[in-house]
């Protein structure tokens, strides 16, 4: 039985003060959650948020990291910096990173490997665009992303990581993936993992859905057998909304 995981990706939102207020408000609302609860603030908010969640059931993730240990990479953050802070998870390969910052499946793979070296659990994002969905190449695209992004890992590592399926065509387009579409596509992703690492690993890996998740959509989504949680964007910026999703 896979434990559900619901993570809030705050993206480029919240000052340090606002971030602390948000988690302070969130703590009592999610204290009885039956799933793993994760918040992913910006880098500058990480120390304050980590301090605020101490003693609670909320874990903290980063939104990205570099694949090198250190060096001349202006504006980047190394994995050991996150590890030293006490960060637990790291989002890798989010569609916005791929779209605006030229993230590729190869860099995703480098980051995933490096995350494990520093005791960070990767939340690896994958998903297809509207053109790809309408061109009926969703499976081909996802297979490519997973086969490259998760190559050359140990079975133990793959069991630990989290995959987030985010249909890019359902983000800010007015189009939404039905629960059936989400479940079916996540089921397909699981078959790709099975082909790479075996049935036992595929049965254990947790795969989230991340396409405009709201308090009103989560219950039906979580009722689907393949969906193991959610990567939540906008709705994670309000404690009440995020708590409603966590306590589905």
Curated annotation (Swiss-Prot):
One GO BP annotation of this record: glyceraldehyde-3-phosphate biosynthetic process
InterPro entries in alphabetical order: Aldolase_TIM (IPR013785), TIM_sf (IPR035990), TrioseP_Isoase_bac/euk (IPR022896), Triosephosphate_isomerase (IPR000652), Triosephosphate_isomerase_AS (IPR020861)
Residue numbers annotated as active site: 94, 166
Cell location: Cytoplasm
Chain positions recorded as substrate binding sites: 9-11, 172, 212, 233-234
Catalytic activity: D-glyceraldehyde 3-phosphate = dihydroxyacetone phosphate
A matching Pfam family: TIM
EC numbers on record: 5.3.1.1
Main subcellular location of this protein, as a coarse class: cytoplasm
One cellular component (GO) term of this entry: cytosol
EC top class named in words: isomerase
Keywords, ordered alphabetically: Cytoplasm, Gluconeogenesis, Glycolysis, Isomerase
Pathway: Carbohydrate biosynthesis; gluconeogenesis; Carbohydrate degradation; glycolysis; D-glyceraldehyde 3-phosphate from glycerone phosphate: step 1/1
Cytoplasm as UniProt keyword: yes
Top-level taxon in the UniProt lineage: Bacteria
GO molecular function, one term: triose-phosphate isomerase activity
Keyword ATP-binding: no
Subunit organization: Homodimer.
Function statement: Involved in the gluconeogenesis. Catalyzes stereospecifically the conversion of dihydroxyacetone phosphate (DHAP) to D-glyceraldehyde-3-phosphate (G3P).
Similarity section: Belongs to the triosephosphate isomerase family.
Protein name: Triosephosphate isomerase
